[in-house]
């Protein structure tokens, strides 16, 4: 697809909501009376991609149901620099976790997308494919070489395409063009220069052993520091709605219904003792009417790592003893549903800097912020076209075998191409725990535990499908994860001690600057860590009883029911989860079409 074609596609998306005949704001009579081959629940990365690929076959009629609305081109969604405004907005499910033991018993806000595009419409837009070792571990756990990196390459090639950044600068040396293809999702490197950019890159030449430069972390080997690739095109956010679904808008065999929740999956009968789960129940409110729909071939749950297990448990699919205790009649005894929840822990670490030219100015100066928005509206340039950080680092702890052995643990990463922790650069103050200072200018490293060992769960709050489930990601729930975060903070300190920062860094800020011993660091970490918003694994594929799904993502013990979202991941990728969810959906669609 040429840049001109993408521009035309983007223009179409900007107006399509008002003219699309197959977008319904609720379950109309027309929808309820139609027959669909596949019904997909949830329009995020998994559901949006699967709906698009399945509807490429004109003989397959697809219904895509989204609980949220259709305003996926809202200004706050479209402007990358406004991503933080989307948390606790009308585009967020507004979940909150239970108190996290590993975070000093603090509950935390748990954002999930509630709009066409799902969490791809509210995330920080980092695009990562994952690593060779990540997928090879999936293949081993699932007992299916189809999930290996080598076998997934055809699906990776269908996924992304590199485009020019907003400022059209020369991107030579910022990514490897030979590993990017003509895929559906346009991505780019940062389109607005920051004064810290050369300092970050220079550090990789000054401290190459500890912080090697990585030309392109999407090669399958993430280790090193490199330029962030983001789902941004022409300075606009790219979501599954503006990419995959945009390609499918005019297909007569795809209907999309928004503002509608799937409350449970229904059995239509039995075959060989297994329930045929091709029915769904839908409603728009807790007090409103319910309706039922049936799929001829399959129901696909793509509601995400929180809502997919929630729907399954409400449908009687889960741990039978637990469901009985909650007043739900068990249909399929599948104890692993809702378990294995894991996530990447997030910690903002900030330094005062010798500069008055940082992104802190946008937060404090309303006039400057208005000027930046006006500039973005005119030509897409300026600081509001930036996502979370212009560079990413993926690193392993030194002497990993000895490090984890001393903790009485095995190396939790998938292998040498996969990181233990991540470092994200930000030209300004960052914290999910501390309010931004009213004075001073900052540089921050976000550190993240990228191969966590802690596991949590999703459980029922009640049998009312409009009640949020109980969410426990168990962040920093093991001493291993705390130790890895401690190493990440130490690495961030070592990074800014390089000569490249000697005239820039002034001092560490706040509680960060008061934490020196390991004990002090651990206390600082527990009191300031949050989530990076990557929940996975709650309906994971795997061999035997340990897997809720088989290797082709079918729910065990059922017929006609599949899961296509990050809940299917047996292990979290050592990277951000948007890209791997798209990859999973690409293969899932091929598997489904192969059975049509």
What does each model-identified segment do?
Residues 2-596:
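N-terminal redox-cofactor-binding region of secreted/periplasmic oxidoreductases
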């Amino acid at each position: 697809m040429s840049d001109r074609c993408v521009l035309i596609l983007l223009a179409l998306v900007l107006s399509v909501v008002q003219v699309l005949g197959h977008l319904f704001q609720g379950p109309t009579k027309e929808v309820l009376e139609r027959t669909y081959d596949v019904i997909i629940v949830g329009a995020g990365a998994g559901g949006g991609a699967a709906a698009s690929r399945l509807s490429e076959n004109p003989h397959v009629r697809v219904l895509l149901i989204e609980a949220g609305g259709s305003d996926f081109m809202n200004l706050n969604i479209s402007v990358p620099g406004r991503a933080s405004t989307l948390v606790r907005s009308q585009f967020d499910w507004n979940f909150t976790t239970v108190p996290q033991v590993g975070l000093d018993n603090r509950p935390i806000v748990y954002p999930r997308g509630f709009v066409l595009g799902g969490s791809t419409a509210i995330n920080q837009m980092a695009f990562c494919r994952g690593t060779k070792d990540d997928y090879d571990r999936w293949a081993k756990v699932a007992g299916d070489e189809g999930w290996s990196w080598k076998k997934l390459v055809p699906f990776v090639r269908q996924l992304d395409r590199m485009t020019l950044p907003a400022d059209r600068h020369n991107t030579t040396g910022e990514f490897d063009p030979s590993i990017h293809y003509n895929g559906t999702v346009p991505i780019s490197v940062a389109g607005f220069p920051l004064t810290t950019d050369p300092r970050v890159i220079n550090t990789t030449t000054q401290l190459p052993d500890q912080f090697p430069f990585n030309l392109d972390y999407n090669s399958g080997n993430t280790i090193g520091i490199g330029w962030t690739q983001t789902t941004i095109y022409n300075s606009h956010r790219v979501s599954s709605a503006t990419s995959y679904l945009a390609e499918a808008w005019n297909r007569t065999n795809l209907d999309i219904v928004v503002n509608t929740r799937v409350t449970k999956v229904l059995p239509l009968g039995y075959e060989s003792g297994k329930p045929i789960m091709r029915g769904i129940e839908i409603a728009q409110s807790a007090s409103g009417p319910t309706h039922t729909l049936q799929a001829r071939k399959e129901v696909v749950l793509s509601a995400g790592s929180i809502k997919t297990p929630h729907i399954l448990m409400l449908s009687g699919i889960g741990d039978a003893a637990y469901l009985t205790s909650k007043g739900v009649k068990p249909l399929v005894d599948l104890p692993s549903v809702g378990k294995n929840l894991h996530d990447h822990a997030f910690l903002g670490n900030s330094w005062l800097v010798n500069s008055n030219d940082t992104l802190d100015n946008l937060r404090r100066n309303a006039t400057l912020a208005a000027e930046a928005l006006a500039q973005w509206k005119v030509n897409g340039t300026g600081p509001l076209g930036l996502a979370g950080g212009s560079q990413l680092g993926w690193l392993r702890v030194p002497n990993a075998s000895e490090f984890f052995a001393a903790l009485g643990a095995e190396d939790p990463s998938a292998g040498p191409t996969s990181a233990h922790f991540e470092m994200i650069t930000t030209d300004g103050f960052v914290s999910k725990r501390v309010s931004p200072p009213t004075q001073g200018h900052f540089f921050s490293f976000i550190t993240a535990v990228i191969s966590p060992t802690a596991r949590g769960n999703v459980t029922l709050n009640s049998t009312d499908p409009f009640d949020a489930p109980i969410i426990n990601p168990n962040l920093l729930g093991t001493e291993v994860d705390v130790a890895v975060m401690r190493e990440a903070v130490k690495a961030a300190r070592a990074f800014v001690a390089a000569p490249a920062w000697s005239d820039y860094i002034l001092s560490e800020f706040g509680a960060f600057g008061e934490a020196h011993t390991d004990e002090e660091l651990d206390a600082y970490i527990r009191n300031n860590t949050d989530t990076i918003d990557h929940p996975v694994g709650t309906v994971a594929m795997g061999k035997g009883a340990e897997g809720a799904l088989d290797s082709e993502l079918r729910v065990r013990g059922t017929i006609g029911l599949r899961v296509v979202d990050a809940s299917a991941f047996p292990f979290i990728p050592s990277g951000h989860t948007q890209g791997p969810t798209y990859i999973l959906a690409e293969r899932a669609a091929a598997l489904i079409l192969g059975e049509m």
